[in-house]
């Protein structure tokens, strides 16, 4: 009996738990959705003051989204409680209690969003185009954002899980680096200006160090950046060799390009994200079957990825 009880307690201790109280929300249902897995999710009937609690197994940093817009970051085994107050459709406040490392990380993530608001730093590049933000301004602001976030996270780096720090840093870097690669070109094409791909453009990504930690590779935005960066490097190499370049525009060609461009955990995670996105798009899913088999045979390291892909194909 003692052994069984100890085993039960041990298993329960490994659970990751999110609980929430929500006030002022006008919807009928409360939704918890996991960024990393479509199979980690819960829903509850709206009842102001009631604690909505959900426990799940996690092996890596996990970002849960409440009601499609409020992010909560957890390490495996963390337990965190959040009180969210709405004013109409807008979130008035989010207050965290629970595991110290998770609370610190989530407060830091809130501060990052506040920095963006203060800087008027838009998350969507199409919004920048609509507001006629000049490429020079976007690049300057992206560099400032990177510096501000690094400074902020340095203050808590010894007090929270490194993987959560890496997750937040990776998300910020993804936004900045994608801006470097895409916004000058988008702006020039929209305004019918000469090509933006001069020497200064290719220098923007010089000195970038790619991340391969669990925290960074758990961040979907960072994996999206890795995919885009693979094509950026291929184009740069082609131009340096005097060759034309056409960015891959089919699922299979993207898969081949990314598989060639990376190694190890970075390749594993980027390919997983590409395949996962294709399957979840629901279009010609049968095309994913041979690709998944090739991925499992040649590139898969994180077995959670292959298991999730198999579930998605069922």
Model-derived features: positions:
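Alpha-helical repeat scaffolds
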Residues: 188-207, 247-258, 284-296
